[in-house]
Design a protein with these regions (language model features):
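Short, aromatic/basic amphipathic alpha-helical patches
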Residues: 53-62, 117-121
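Acidic catalytic patch
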Residues: 42-46, 63-85
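Short, well-structured N-terminal submotif of metal-dependent ribonuclease cores
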Residues: 1-39, 49-56, 133-137
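Structural signal for conserved beta-strand scaffold positions within catalytic alpha/beta enzyme cores
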Residues: 39, 70-71, 125-127
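Alpha-helix capping/helix-boundary segments
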Residues: 43, 76, 94-95, 113-114
Length: 137
């Protein structure tokens, strides 16, 4: 699942709590206009799979903060196939391809495997905690 689900995960682990705090900090900066949020059809799709309607509605509210929503096309599929060859799971590959299509500077993920495997792209793939540390003034 994507970072917008992190606040709804079991907060018993320190790492999950830190990532949750980072996600909330990032969302606040988006609301204040300091950052821009890019959304995609993949985020909508994953959210639609969530059986918890309350969480789905919370994430739908986050999607309303996005200035742009990336829709599927052939370029995204081709790009995603390249990521899959690097060992990235199909859904994650589509997320990355959407971010590239949207011209994102950063791709935020709590998945260490994606951070490690998504190389040689014109976008920084980073954990939300590291993003906050790197970008807060």
């Amino acid at each position: 699942m994507n970072i917008y689900n992190r606040p709804f995960d079991d907060q018993a682990q320190v790492r999950i709590r830190l990532e949750t705090i980072a996600v909330f900090s990032i969302l606040q900066r988006i609301k204040e206009g300091d950052l821009q949020l890019l959304w995609s059809f993949m985020l909508d799709y994953e959210n639609s799979l969530n059986p918890n309607i309350d969480i789905r509605q919370e994430i739908e509210q986050v999607s309303a903060l996005a200035g742009n929503t990336i829709m599927p096309d052939d370029a995204i599929l081709i790009s995603a196939q390249t990521f899959e060859k690097q060992g990235i799971k199909p859904r994650d590959a589509l997320h990355l391809a959407c971010a590239i299509k949207g011209g994102a500077d950063y791709f935020l993920t709590c998945d260490d495997k994606i951070v490690k495997r998504a190389t040689d792209i014109n976008m920084k793939v980073i954990n939300p905690v590291m993003f906050v540390e790197e970008t807060e003034v």
